Amino acid sequence: GHFLQHPILAADLCHLLLSLRGNTATYNQIFCTAGPEIAESRTYYEMIADILNVELQINETPVDVHLKENPNSAPFLCHRIYDLAKLKASGAHVPATPLKEGLRQHAESLITSNA
């Protein structure tokens, strides 16, 4: 629950990708991309529980215990934050949907598609 993440809304990612077309400043470049907010994993799941109006239960497992049982998961046990300065400087669309709003939109789309 303590690792930092930098999630992006799929619609923001699509907008970003479309903004690359014809933008020669982005050709042959590699960019990091993410949403505008960084959140601790615990906070991320608290937001989802709040949006769904359900109780959240988090059972933390110490990292060393998890790694011993799941050695292939090592690449995922880290903070995931990104510098968007190069993306912004290129003139491409920079994702701007606030995290809670993006989670709300995503949850609503999943609920309505399964209705």
Tell where the protein language model's regions lie, with residue ranges.
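A conserved pocket-lining segment of Rossmann-fold NAD(P)-dependent short-chain dehydrogenase/reductase
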Residues: G1-I8, S19, C32
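A conserved structural motif in NAD(P)-dependent oxidoreductases
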Residues: Q5-L13, P98
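Conserved C-terminal active-site "lid" loop/helix of NAD(P)H-dependent oxidoreductases
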Residues: A10, E40-R42, V65-V94
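Mid/C-terminal beta-alpha module of Rossmann-like enzyme folds, strongest
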Residues: C14, S19-N72
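Generic structural signal for alpha-helix termini and adjacent loop/cap motifs
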Residues: L20-T24, S90, S109, S113
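C-terminal accessory subdomains/tails of enzymes that are appended
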Residues: M47, I51, N70-F76, A89-G91, ...
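Amphipathic terminal alpha-helices
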Residues: L67, T97-A115
